[in-house]
Amino acid sequence: MIRHFTSTVFVVFKNKIALHWHEKVRMWLPPGGHVDLNEDPIQTALRECKEEMGIDISIFSEHKYKFEDTNLQNINPPQTILIEKVEDNKIGPHEHIDFIYFGYPKDPNFKLLSNWIWVDSKDLMNEVKFKNPELKYFAPPNDVKVLGMDALVKLKNLSN
């Protein structure tokens, strides 16, 4: 089975998460993408937010280790790691090993690209359907609902 490493970030601001309509997989998703050669998963998360959303973010982590050894650098762990089954017409069936992070904008006066929507906890809990570019309505998938709710709880006081 072919496997790719990916990173996804649930970006929280003012008690909402940012989602966009992903044309390829046809779902409302947070920013994310494949880990590039010589990139660690956090670098991927930061890059994808800049490329897809046009903003710089900070990664939230509950784990902070400090080492005095200059040969060691700590990379904070993700909130979770998902194995996601993917169907692709070019590659065929494969899996994504997806590092899931929570983050928030570095600059509270950021300008978000127009293809993004802000979704709050009520929207997630009630499985509200949002209009995509084809004027059809879809709710975010269950994993986005569950992880989005967790991100909103954990970052409640950091993103206002």
Annotated model-derived regions:
Residues 1-17, 34-37:
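Conserved N-terminal beta-strand and adjoining loop/helix that marks the start
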Residues 16-67:
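Conserved Nudix-box catalytic region and its N-terminal flanking loop in Nudix hydrolases
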Residues 5, 41, 144-147:
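Generic hydrophobic secondary-structure packing signal
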Residues 54-107:
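Active-site segment of metal-dependent pyrophosphate-handling enzymes
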Residues 4, 22, 34, 94-96:
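Histidine-centered active-site/metal-ligand motif
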Residues 11-13, 21, 104-105:
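Residue-level signal for short segments within beta-strands and strand-turn junctions
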Residues 26-28, 92-160:
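Nudix hydrolase/Nudix homology domain
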Residues 10, 46, 50, 149-152:
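Residues within alpha-helical segments
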